[in-house]
Regions:
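Short, non-transmembrane alpha-helical segments in secretory-pathway proteins
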Residues: 30-51, 95-115
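Amphipathic N-proximal alpha-helical interface segments
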Residues: 12-17, 62, 66-90, 132-154
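Aromatic side chains
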Residues: 45, 49, 64, 68, ...
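Short amphipathic alpha-helical segments, especially helix-boundary/capping motifs
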Residues: 16-22, 39-41, 76-81, 92, ...
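A cross-family detector of function-defining hotspots
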Residues: 53-70, 114-133
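Flexible "stalk/tail and boundary" regions
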Residues: 19-20, 106-119, 123-128, 143-155
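Sec-dependent signal peptide cleavage junction
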Residues: 3-43, 155
Length: 155
């Protein structure tokens, strides 16, 4: 049976731009594995994602990244040292992509197949990270829930 997706509250302390900046600082730093995050972070995580299992923590630039599973779904999220949730993302099926996002993708790359899809909740935004494949070509797109394409990169 499918497990309901949690819908935790993302902090409103920071603007979307500030959150993006904080996440970028995490990504460019060398993150360290963490056995146990501060209790304020782990207790907030346990409230936000009570069914999480296979939990792995890392830290860099004062940001805690946690990767885990709920049911068969992979998740990743980011907390501040105060336990404020900045972003969470999870893998979704092609059937779960909103029509406007799917249509924007197909319009741009009609011959490509959907490969890996993540739904991202970052600040007040909902985005979709969509990887497409066509023969040997891969493209990764970042699309807002209204269908606006923010970024594309070929691999």
């Amino acid at each position: 049976s499918a497990i309901a997706q949690p819908k935790p509250s993302i902090t409103t302390k920071h603007t979307n731009d500030k959150i993006k900046e904080m996440l970028t600082s995490f990504k460019i730093a060398n993150s360290q594995d963490v056995i146990t995050p501060p209790s304020v972070v782990s207790s907030k995580f346990n409230i936000d994602f009570p069914q999480a299992r296979d939990i792995e923590w890392e830290v860099a630039s004062g940001i805690y990244e946690v990767e885990f599973e709920i049911g068969y779904t992979d998740y990743k999220c980011y907390y501040t040292t105060d336990g404020d949730l900045l972003m969470y993302a999870f893998n979704i099926n092609v059937l779960d992509i909103p029509a406007v996002v799917k249509n924007a993708t197909i319009a741009k790359y009609p011959d490509y197949d959907f490969d890996d899809i993540k739904e991202i909740h970052r600040g007040t935004e909902v985005l979709f990270d969509i990887e497409l494949k066509h023969r040997n070509i891969e493209v990764e797109m970042l699309i807002l829930e209204n269908g606006t394409i923010l970024n594309e990169k070929f691999d």
